[in-house]
Amino acid sequence: MNLWDNMLRGKEATLAGIIRVIIEEEPETQDEIAEKLGISRRYVAKLLKPLIDEKIVRHPYIVDMSKLHKINLEFDEYILMKEIKTTLEKMEKTLLNNLDLVYTALKNSDKKLAEDIIIKDYALNKMEEEVRILLSMNALKYLPGAYANALATIASNLERLGDYIANIAEEVVHGLKLDKDIENEVNMIFTLLKEMLTEAIDVVKSKKKETKIHELEEKLHKNLELLLNKVLENKREDLNFYVQFGMFLKDIERFGDRCVNIVDIALELYHNIPRNPIPERLKRGML
């Protein structure tokens, strides 16, 4: 266990306060920091020493945020990340609820419920804007540029997931009905979508490196293929059904792709694992 690990466990709040004062007040001496926080200069010196030794803090008291995050990525929780993660969790909860609702609307051909889902989508737009406002107000002070850009992109991806759910709801409003004999397949697909979303947000929150997102993605596409084949076996004269069903499949596929994209963004941010520049659908040889 290094000095950082030992120190942060009991003195995180004071250390965060010191860093905040350095960033916001630009003090020239440790006495100024101590006076601002109501603690002794000796205590300030003790907490700052490891940061100065690692060149994370330089005199006259400038913080190298990139080094701070490399040494202790959990430090960002103390200042800004907690607020942003709370908003991302709210977006996840809204999306999971809307997935359940749109599945019910699809299963029961419930146009009124589908219309309500479309209206609910605006809540996700507001949450994405909330993240962007938080970042625009604070990111330059407390987060490296890579964090701000990645978190804004993750919030944008979550908002787009809401759009795909709203698109499915619109197809229900326009008359999309699925046969009873494919209910099990459709139920499995929505279960996988919820698992993929939950996994994506977990990677963002926990910063874990190992993820099952690609395994879930593979299961999703196998189930989509099974569903498509089953639908094509039951030939219909209504061409409009195939158009609507095709749009439904496309939105499901895009939902899964966005979940993978969120994980890729998080892995690049936290672990420097480069993202594949080729979109998921093109990697599968599909346009």
From Swiss-Prot:
GO terms for biological process, alphabetical: intracellular phosphate ion homeostasis; negative regulation of phosphate metabolic process
Gene3D superfamilies assigned: Homeodomain-like, Phosphate transport system protein phou homolog 2, domain 2
Protein's recorded name: Uncharacterized protein MJ1641
Organism (species): Methanocaldococcus jannaschii (strain ATCC 43067 / DSM 2661 / JAL-1 / JCM 10045 / NBRC 100440)
User: What does the organism's lineage look like at the top?
Assistant: Archaea, Methanobacteriati, Methanobacteriota, Methanomada group, Methanococci
